[in-house]
């Protein structure tokens, strides 16, 4: 773990992180962080002391069949925008959060807002998809976000920002 992952030409293509092994030995399926991600993360750590990723200042909930049926959504995939931080660039771009509070497990979520279905053309079905689409984005980058609103698909351009930089950076 932590060593370089090399291709057949001896070029580093990743950093090994973990091995899944049923035998407990160093044989099995290995996982690695791509070298492009590692370079950016290391650069951010050196320059800023933290990873500097672009964010949209949203509170999201994964859409499920259960939620979609309850809320009467016409789709059963995507990420529901529960809340949008006041004063954020996402709010300025027109993305809408929900306005109907619903108890979901131990949390209150807000339904009726936009549902994010794609970012820069990449389908968004899960929170992992959402984070993957933003993985290499930095504050100041603009992304094209496809949302489902009132049974229609719309495309919004949202400029990403740094966590806590909105005019009102209180919690979402």
Where do the PLM segments sit?
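A residue-level detector for well-ordered beta-strand positions
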Residues: 3-4
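C-terminal recognition in membrane/secretory proteostasis and scaffolding
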Residues: 7-8, 12, 37-172
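Short beta->alpha transition motifs characteristic of CBS
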Residues: 16-19
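Short, flexible turn/loop "capping" segments at secondary-structure junctions
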Residues: 21-23, 73-74
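Short loop-to-beta-strand junctions
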Residues: 23-29, 51-54
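Glycine- and other small-residue-rich loops at beta-strand/loop junctions that grip anionic moieties
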Residues: 30-31, 82
